[in-house]
Amino acid sequence: MALVTPRTLSGFKDRLPKEALAKAHLLNKVSNVFMNFGFVPIETPHLEYADVLIKQGSDEIQKELYRFKDHGGRDVALRFDLTVPLARFVSQYKNEVGLPFKRYAIGNVFRGERAQRGRYREFTQCDFDFIGSDSISCDAEILQVIYASLMKLGIEEFTIWLNHRSILNGICEYCGITQEKDINVALRIIDKLDKIGKERVSEELQKELGLNNNQVENLLEYTSIKQQGESESFFRQISFMEEWNDSIKKGIEDLKMLYEVLSSLQMDRDTYRVNFSIARGLGYYTGIVYETTLNALKSIGSVCSGGRYDNLTRTFSKEKMSGVGASIGIDRLLAALEELELLQKRATSARALIVCMDRLYFGYAHLLAESFRCSEIPIEVYPEASKLKKQFTYAHLKGYEFVVVIGENEFNTKTLTLKNMTSGVQIDSISFLKALALIQEE
C-alpha cells in the first residue's frame, strides 16, 4: 500500500507548539480586554446555509466563498467572516440576548483568495461588536478596544485610519457615479489604493466603470486626502467638501462627533487619523469605517479593521438593528509580532521542568509538582530518569524558565536544586518555599 505524503493545501497551515502557544497567549490577552469592556463570548457554526452569507458579502467576497452541496444536497458555505453570522445570530436570538448587545467571538474563517505573505485562506478572526445602538458612543468604544488591545500586546506605534462611507458615497456622486452598484464597485477598487497604487486603480476604474480621465482624476484626488496634522486644522481644510452634497456633510459631522469623544480619552491623538481612501472591502458598512496599520510594518496590511453596519440584519429581520464592530486579524498580527520581535515563543505551557536522576525519585518529584501547581506555577515532570545532559537538552529545546533537579541528596533531605535557564544561576538544596518564592519573583 502506497504511503500518503504528509502535506497541507496552499493557504492553510499547521501550527507547531511554539506558535500555537503564542497564539493562545495573544488571544487570552485580547479576550481579557474585551471582557473589561463588558463584551461577552458567543459561538456560531463554521458552516452556514449559503444564502445566509452570500446576500451580505461583496461581489469580491462571493468570488472567494467556499461554497458546495453537502451530503443532503443543501447549498452551504464556509463562513468568510464572523460578522454576517452575528447578524443571523442576533436576528434569531434578539429576545434572549437583549439589546443593546455586546459580544466577542474568536474562530476560523475561510476565503479562497490568493495566498501570500500575511494572508491565508483559513485564518482566525477575533471580533467584537456592539449591536442595537446607533450612538457615536459605541463607535468610540470600539476604537478604545482596538487601542487597549494593541497596547496590551506591547504595540505602541500604530495608526487607526478612519473614514466614513457617506463621505465616499458623496465623493462618488460628485464625480458622476450615482448608481449604488457602481458606487460599490468604485469603493472596492479605491480600497486597493494603498496596496496597488494610483496607476492600477485608475486602470480598473476605467475598465470596470467606463469613467473618463477627468472623473478618475477627481475621484483619486479626493479619496487620497489624509489627515496630516491636528484634527481641527484638517476639518477646516476639508470644509469646502460639505457643500457638495448631504452625504459628505453627514460623514464629516459624524467624524467630528467621534473626535470630540476621543479627545476626552487618554488615547494618544497621533494614533487615529482620517484617510479618505479607506473603504473596506465588505459591502455592508454604512457609517464610520477604519483600518489599523503598524507604523514599523505597514507592508503587512491592516491588523484590525471594521466599521458601522446599520443595515446588516435587513436580510433576516424587518427590524433595523444598528451595529458597529471590528475584527482583529490574529494570524497577520502574529506574523507582525514575530517580525517585530515582540513575540515570546516557547514550546511548553509550563514554566518549569522537574528532572530526576533516578526513577526512585518520581514520587517525590510528582509531590513537588503538585505543590507548585497549587501555587499557580505550571510545571511538569520529565518522564524518564535519563542522563542529566539529555534532560537539560530537552529543557532548552522546549524553553522552560526553570529546571528543578532531584538527586539523592535532594530526595533524602526533601529539598531541591533550582536552575534559572535564562541567567544560568543554580541554587543547590533549597526548600520548596524558597524555590517557589524565586520563581514567583520572575
Swiss-Prot record:
PROSITE patterns: AA_TRNA_LIGASE_II. Keywords: Aminoacyl-tRNA synthetase, ATP-binding, Cytoplasm, Ligase, Nucleotide-binding, Protein biosynthesis. It holds the Pfam family tRNA-synt_His. GO terms for molecular function: ATP binding; histidine-tRNA ligase activity. InterPro entries: aa-tRNA-synth_II, aa-tRNA-synth_II/BPL/LPL, Anticodon-bd, Anticodon-bd_dom_sf, His-tRNA-ligase, HisRS-like_core, HisRS/HisZ. It catalyses: tRNA(His) + L-histidine + ATP = L-histidyl-tRNA(His) + AMP + diphosphate + H(+). GO terms for cellular component: cytoplasm. It comes from the Bacteria. GO terms for biological process: histidyl-tRNA aminoacylation. It is found in: Cytoplasm. Its EC number is 6.1.1.21. Belongs to the class-II aminoacyl-tRNA synthetase family. PANTHER family: HISTIDINE--TRNA LIGASE, HISTIDYL-TRNA SYNTHETASE. Homodimer. This is Histidine--tRNA ligase. It comes from Helicobacter hepaticus (strain ATCC 51449 / 3B1). The lineage of its organism: Bacteria, Pseudomonadati, Campylobacterota, Epsilonproteobacteria, Campylobacterales.
